[in-house]
Regions:
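Catalytic nucleophile serine of serine hydrolases
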Residues: 105
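Extended, subdomain-level signal for the structured scaffold at the beginning of enzyme domains
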Residues: 1-97, 101, 109-119, 130-173
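Active-site-adjacent substrate-recognition loops and nearby beta-strands
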Residues: 126
């Protein structure tokens, strides 16, 4: 188990894409990681397709120096999460420390609001945020999943297998 005892947080809010949350969580657990689900508060969250998720922690309680990596799943949740300073600050701190951040689908909108999309960085996600990612300085890349520095990017639900492969490889280095 390549990720034994590594603590990884996944950020959620109402409307998170169920599969983009749950499949990477299970895959990382298979590798031995402890995956924390963090919400804006401790109330259960309903996924976009009906999954009910109870957070393990609040985002505000997370500390970048205690986390190995961060996952930003898509759905409608990123549009809510990107508005909160606690979210943006955590993402900025993780990025500044060079820690891996997995970004799939609309999760890229959090990366934009946190200011971690680097000028000229290859990016991908839902085509619904393509213009936003490009306007933030990214170079749109229509590939299922890839690693760019400490960021692991993926487009959509159909790309979850490729996302999980790239994510595990980046985290196992």
């Amino acid at each position: 188990m390549r990720l034994q005892n590594k603590v990884i947080a996944t950020l959620i809010a109402e409307g998170v894409e169920d599969l983009e949350y749950y499949v990477p969580l299970m895959r990382l657990q298979e590798e031995g990681a402890q995956v924390l689900t963090a919400g804006l508060d401790m109330k259960p969250v309903h996924g976009k397709n009906g999954l009910v998720i109870t957070p393990d922690a609040t985002i505000e309680a997370l500390k970048a120096d205690e986390l190995f990596a961060l996952i930003l799943p898509g759905g409608w949740a990123p549009d809510k999460l990107r508005r909160y300073d606690a979210v943006k600050n955590l993402v900025k701190e993780m990025d500044a420390a060079g820690k891996v951040i997995g970004i799939i689908c609309h999760g890229g909108s959090i990366a934009i609001s946190a200011g971690i999309v680097r000028q000229g960085e290859r990016v991908t996600g839902s085509t619904g945020i393509k213009d936003d990612l490009v306007n933030a300085g990214g170079v749109w890349t229509d590939e299922p999943a890839f690693r760019e520095g400490n960021h692991v990017w993926a487009r959509v639900v159909a790309d979850i297998p490729a996302f999980c492969r790239e994510l595990v490889e980046a985290l196992a280095e």
